[in-house]
Every structure is written in C-alpha cells, then in structure tokens.
Amino acid sequence: MIHARIAGTGSYLPGNPVSNDDLVARGIDTSDDWVVSRTGIRTRYLAPPDVGSSDLALVAAQRAIEAAGCAANDIDLIIVATSTPDYIFPSTATLLQSKLGIGNNGAAFDVQAVCSGFVYALSIAEKFIRSGSHKRALVVGAEVFSRILDWTDRATCVLFGDGAGAVVLEASERPGVLTTALHADGSHHPILCVPGNVATGQVVGDPFLRMDGQAVFKFAVKVLGDVAHEVLDAAGVAADSVDWLIPHQANIRIIQATAKRLGLSMEKVVATVDRHGNTSAASIPLALDLAVRDGRIRPGQRVVVEGVGGGFTWGAALIDF
C-alpha cells in the first residue's frame, strides 16, 4: 500500500519582527497590553510592498526541498494554499513552479480555504500520492495578509502577519499522514470575509478583512475540538497518544481552549502566535517547521494539525512524523 509521509519542512518570515509598540508608533490606536491580553500576539512580520506570496513561498519551498534531500525537479505536484495570491491568475503555484525552475513537470494549482488552507492542501496532496498518480508533492501555505487589512480597524489589523511554510510530501511504504478530515459551512461566511472583488478595473465592495471576533472564537473552539476527535477516532487512537498538537495560530485563547477540549496540556501544543501573529494558511506549516528545526518534533512522534478559516472551512490531519 502507498502512503504519504512528510520528508522535509521549511518556512520563511519576511524582514524583522514588528512589535505591538511598533504598530502604536505607526499610529495604530492600540497598546501592547491590549493586544497581548486579548490575543497573545507580541510580534508579527510584514512583507515589503515588492514581495508577494510567491516570493515567500519560494524560500520556504527551497528550505523544505533541501530538508527532504531531494531536488526541485523531483517534485511532480505543487499545491499552494493562499488567500492573497500574487495575481487573480495565473495561480501562485504555477509562479512558484517557474521560480523553482521545475518547468513542465506535473501539476500545480492553488487552494483557497483561508486559515484552514494548508490542511486542505495537505489532504488533497495525500490523496494524489496514495492514488499513485504522483510521487512527491510540495505543499505550501503562503500569505501577505497585510495587503488586505484595514489599518484603521484596530480590532483586526493587529492580529495578522505575513509568511510562508512548506512541506515535501512523498510516497512511502511507511504510514505518515494517517487520517484527514475536511469540512465547510458557507452559511457562516459573513462572520469572517473580505467582501470585495475586482470588476471592470475597479474594486467592487469592501477590499478589507472584516470579522466578528466573538462569533469566530465560539465557532473555532467548537469545530477544532470536534475535528481533532474525528481524525483520532478514524485512526482508532486516543488523544493521549498525540505527542504534539499544531492548531492554526489565530489567538492564544482559542489554542488553549482547543487543547483543553482534547485533554492535552499546553506543553504538548506548538504555539507561535505570540511571535508570528495570525498568518492564515501559513500558520500551521510555519509552526511545524519551527518545532522540527528546534528539535521538539522528532521522527516517530504523532502530530495533529488543524485549522479553521473563513467560509467557514475547517479540517485536521493526524500524522506520524
């Protein structure tokens, strides 16, 4: 039987960390105490104007490919999860394919599921590999969310950051990705959205992120707990067999509440929201790569990754690393 396992991870954060006090100095009506007490966020990274999602994705991808011990030309599938693509089209994945110098070698496409995008992309790639149609996939979450923030809205602009994370997923006789679960409920779309588009050369509607924070919190805590239990039950394993939980890094309170629902201590949770802020589809692979490189996540350990994003969309994956 063909399985899909993670062979390498990589990540990239642009520039220097931007603190809450830095935002205050830029004229944002907030304070370090206000942001930290409500979200746990202390810093985030903001890409310069000439850097797009494909640029961030390129560095993260190169690092993941190097960690996997393969060459770029060995990749025959690229899936990029992003809500902030470089262009309306072509896809960021095809731009990344070109920047990697891969050329005509397999498929490349984007997935848009906002903050759960990486879990969606990972699940899709795993299915491609298990089918036998592809052997080595590059799965990337990359975002420049700073481009869609209303910097006069202190309730949202302090929450988000830019970055990219990537994994190389390859065919293996040894199980890696054990189970995945994906869900969506579009009836909740007004709670978290960017309700605008481009038509006839003009921005139609509102081009900035809008969010009902309390509604997002309640929904996220419920579905993240549910979907984590779903992948554990599907694999027939208990929560106490999990070595690490890597949730979407939106808010430390959501992360703490999710861990509590699973009966896991925070010592088993990889939390980077304090350093990275909410990087949407990039948050999970960023946290994963950090924990791999600092030695917390080691071969043979069991990891749950999970995310929830606008739509709403949500999902989880159980992985033997």
From Swiss-Prot:
GO terms for cellular component: cytoplasm. This is Beta-ketoacyl-[acyl-carrier-protein] synthase III. Pfam families: ACP_syn_III (PF08545), ACP_syn_III_C (PF08541). PANTHER family: 3-OXOACYL-[ACYL-CARRIER-PROTEIN] SYNTHASE, BETA-KETOACYL-[ACYL-CARRIER-PROTEIN] SYNTHASE III, CHLOROPLASTIC. The keyword Nucleotidyltransferase does not apply. The lineage of its organism: Bacteria, Pseudomonadati, Pseudomonadota, Betaproteobacteria, Rhodocyclales. Pathway: Lipid metabolism; fatty acid biosynthesis. HAMAP family: FabH. GO terms for biological process: fatty acid biosynthetic process. Residues 249-253 are annotated as: ACP-binding. It catalyses: malonyl-[ACP] + acetyl-CoA + H(+) = 3-oxobutanoyl-[ACP] + CO2 + CoA. Its EC number is 2.3.1.180. GO terms for molecular function: 3-oxoacyl-[acyl-carrier-protein] synthase activity; beta-ketoacyl-acyl-carrier-protein synthase III activity. InterPro entries: ACP_syn_III_C, ACP_syn_III_N, FabH, Thiolase-like. The active site is at C115, H248, N278.
